Amino acid sequence: MSKLIYLDNAATTQVYPEVLQEMLPYFSEVYSNPSAIYSFASESKKAVDKARTSVAELINAKTDEIYFTGGGSESDNWALKATADAYASKGKHIITSTIEHHAILHTCAYLEKKGFEITYVNVDENGKVKLDELEAAIRPDTILISIMTANNEIGTIQPVREIGRIAHEHGVLFHTDAVQAFGHIPIDVDEMNIDMLSASGHKINGPKGIGVMYIRKGVKILSFIHGGAQERKRRAGTLNVPGIV
């Protein structure tokens, strides 16, 4: 077999050996449900709490603003669909860019079928969102701006801080798909004016099937997946402890 030369890390990455070793005990030794109340479950809960704290510290968030999901696409869907549902009484207009990931673009297409209006802002020759066009697109009924932090195909890093500032000056929520940037460039949700952020484990040498959603306190979006009371009643389903750690 010829030696593999892998050049697709923007799509997915190899799980680091040390990550795999950290995961293994939670498959066969500490396999308890972290939501349970017996003592064996406390070990799983401690591992989840530790991981939640690590993620929060990485982006300067509070631990209770971090939610674990099934991946970046789920987080993107949650941000857009739940915001649309929660803030529809204020307006049905959302702004995004023409070069977002399909998890955003296809969700926007879904929302258009539900009666929402989407404005797709253009980018310049370097792939950066045109800030003047973005600000001009804001209307009284705009409820959300969603612009990715870094593009998954051309690598352009967007002026997230400025986009967030513009959003907040107009009383609009700001979500960023940071799947391609999380763990690679510094992210500070306060300094960058971010209300919601999506991230994924398999882009940073972790396993597939685990994602993160940051939701700033005060953002009034509700459950996206219904069922149990996991993730402070906002995201149902038994937690994927091996993936989370």
Tell me the role of every PLM-derived stretch:
Residues M1-V245:
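Pyridoxal 5′-phosphate
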